Amino acid sequence: MKVIVLLLVLAVMQPVIQSQPFPGTGELPMTRRPPKKELEYWCTYAKSCDFCWNCRHGVCKNKVFEKHPLIKKNDYIQICRVSRYNERCSYFTDTRIRRFHIMSCTNPTYYDWFDELMQVKEDRVIDTENIKHTCLCMIATIALIGYIRKQYSRMQLQAATRLLIFLGLYVLLGILMTNIIMNLPLSTDNPMQMRRPPERDLKFWCTYAKHCDFCWTCKDGMCKNKVFSDHPIITQNDYIVNCTVSRWHDRCMYEAHFRIHYQHNMNCSQPKDLEWFIELKRHVINQDDL
């Protein structure tokens, strides 16, 4: 009970503690936006943070670097918090997936947390050997569960111990089944591989998977849409994500490859435009900070 009370007190005090300045020289409390005089510093090393951008009608201009190209308002721009304590400067993204970076204030290093978050392999091929291994493990698990159930009456164990054993086995079985389902063949021409779409299918995929890299041609940091010529040119950033696609009968699927893989399945003849990237990175913006 004492531990629970202590945790509740800490939870209540946390906002108060965060709002207080850090002790020492040159302190900056954990705040959503740095002072204007420090914008050039922070926007050099935290380029994706929202306090570096002025957005209007879906187009964003960099507050600090006038020569920076205009970009479309998208999820490359993240809500950030910054702080400074003596020679330690830090910033992190205030999203569901929080990314923290601490650096020396006098000798900072540029760290693209978003780039690392989105780091992926160029192609993903389903490993058939892994599927075989998973199936064997599932069969062995089912056999083990059957054996334990048969010996249930002979086991001289407490009821709680028996329950934990069965729960553990069923969780393992569930994990194995999920692994198999996620590796089911989905492509008719090459059922064991997700791949880039052919040129003739680009218009379809780029309508419903707008962020996928196969929809864009990038050169010197500027990206042009391959399909829709009237789409504005955007700067090359992590709004564009590596993707692979697959089609099986009337089931179409595309997958975004980053550390948290996201898959979207849809009816090929009646597809649904799903902004998976926006849903994943959705966050609440404090209107007072706009």
From Swiss-Prot:
Pfam families given in the database record: v110 (PF01639)
Sugar attachment sites: 242, 267
Predominant location category: host cell
InterPro entries xref list: ASFV_fam_110 (IPR004848)
Segments crossing the lipid bilayer: 1-19, 128-148, 163-183
Membrane topology: Multi-pass membrane protein
Domain of life of the organism encoding this protein: Viruses
Cellular component terms (Gene Ontology): host cell membrane; membrane
Keywords: Glycoprotein, Host membrane, Membrane, Transmembrane, Transmembrane helix
Intracellular or extracellular location(s): Host membrane
Family (UniProt): Belongs to the asfivirus MGF 110 family.
Physiological role: Plays a role in virus cell tropism, and may be required for efficient virus replication in macrophages.
Protein name: Protein MGF 110-9L
